[in-house]
Amino acid sequence: MFLFLSALTAPALAQEGPGSNPIIRDKFTADPAPMVDGDRLYLYVGHDEAQRDEMFNMREWLAYSTTDMKHWTDHGPIMHVSDFKWAKKDAWASQTIKKNGKYWFYAAVEHDNTHPGKAIAVAVSDKPTGPFVDAKGSALITNQMTPKGTHSWEDIDPTVFTDDDGTTWIAWGNRQCYIAKLKPNMIEIDGPIREITPAHFEEGPWLHKRGKLYYLTYASLDRASHRDERISYATASSLNGPWTYRGELTGSGKYSFTIHAGIAEFKNEWYIFLHNAALAIGDLNGAIGRRAVTVEHLEYNADGTMKPVMQTDAGVSAPPSGK
């Protein structure tokens, strides 16, 4: 299905052109995770289905793709949480990467009562749009593997990154941020799990590299001064750290307590995907469990730091500020 989803929501949104925000307008979506494969950028999102006073109701993950950042193809659901037979509920944040000719999908779910709490699942497919199947038959990471946390949702929001030497790393967490290597089979942790929690870390880590610098971007919450999450980041010359806090990259998402970043370089331009709660569909307004994915240009300073990102309605329909 080929779409620019403008006509299916409030009139104020319907007047915006291709590339404007939000990207997806016929469904509530959250936790964007881009992946570039050839001349196409794929975007994986969680499907927010909360009704009225529900907090979160997320049962499936969706995929979209584009070749120009303005027109998007809807590939439909790629997995349901029930596809992980050991999982109980909650199709939370995910990321997909390509390695060795296959597509590996990592996602946070609620484990059944054999391992209570949140867990990280891994699935695999021969195609970026699926079908994906459980690659392990059990969780990659469970709450019992990170005993420092004081809450059952510590092990969420995986980000996966393959370094130049071919080693794949996974980072994740809520309140604490953890990192570990993956074995070449992509379904087992290789070595120790280490904590790398940067300043004000709340959740939603995202790893990427530009030049020789590694970036850890994440949802931050300074409880002394803020009520809603913002995006902050840290940098390092090695994934082993030390990580240097670089400050806030964005403000909070409009009408949303949560925010979640995904970053990609596509056709020589950098982009940051986010979510807010500014979309209305029919008689349902945006809310904590009804969010909308957006995209903005991402620019860098000469020293490698990222320029602050303003969240806009125009999105990438407008050129980046440096051009």
Residue ranges and their predicted role:
Residues 1-10:
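Bacterial N-terminal signal peptides
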Residues 13-323:
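Carbohydrate-active catalytic/glycan-binding domains of CAZyme proteins
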